[in-house]
Amino acid sequence: LLQQGGWESAATPALFARYCGRIARDLGHLIGGGCTINEVNIGRVLISSGIMPTMGKIRQSPGWIEASTQLGITPEELNPFMFAVSEQGRAVVMAAHHQAVDAIRASGATFPVGATLAVQDIVSVSGGETIAAQHRQTVNEAYLTDLVGDDFVGVQCYTRHRYDASGPMPPEAGIELTQMGYEFWPEALESAIRQAHATSGLPVMVTENGLATTDDRRRIAYVERALNGVKNCLDEGIPVMGYTYWSALDNFEWMLGYTPTFGLIAVDRQTQTRTVKDSAVWLGGVARSNTLR
């Protein structure tokens, strides 16, 4: 696939849709809800927030050059999903999503289907209004407006991103940070839900939200504040289908390995022993009672 243009090739959507159609045909009876692509906007999110360098710099990196050489293509022709950030890349990703939705429905599957986005709570400080609006359009709105016909939009949000006239700002000195280096800001979820629904017109499913920390008391505090934001949305009539915490178990967090601990259940990687945390008991109580104190 990468040798044929990857996620900038017009041939990719049909191949992806064929795959999704087969999954739905053979396993659809086991699926309660489907997300075709996880975080369709992730590449733009990482570059916009300064977490990942620009594509110009990435294509000059030794690993990128080696990968393209092994594939027999140029660095400019290497287009993995994570780096489909150009307008052509965005168009191909969204075409793949829409064709996948059609293929899933054509398979006879009846479960609701959508896509998930890393919806950024982009806020501006004095002087940053214009650039914040530009990033909001590039990262969020360009995708949220292209979900017509879906059953829902999956929202994944962990923190806010502040912008001044120069671009993304680091967290303020002395502010509480998570193990991911994010600002502790659970209120971001409410803002993300509001923007996702207002822009897409779709019901919202919170498909990821959580806290990487060694202090489980802070996890409970974070989730409680985030859920209060969800309740605010529900009270105003915004259709929020549900809330999914990330994650049940301490997970493998890509290049960060097992260092960040998001889980409601701890995992000892030496023995694989699982230990239920207080946050799991607390969240289970919220779910059973369907109330927040």
Please report, for each region that a protein language model flagged, where it lies by residue.
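Non-catalytic scaffold segments within catalytic domains of secreted glycoside hydrolases
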Residues: 1-293
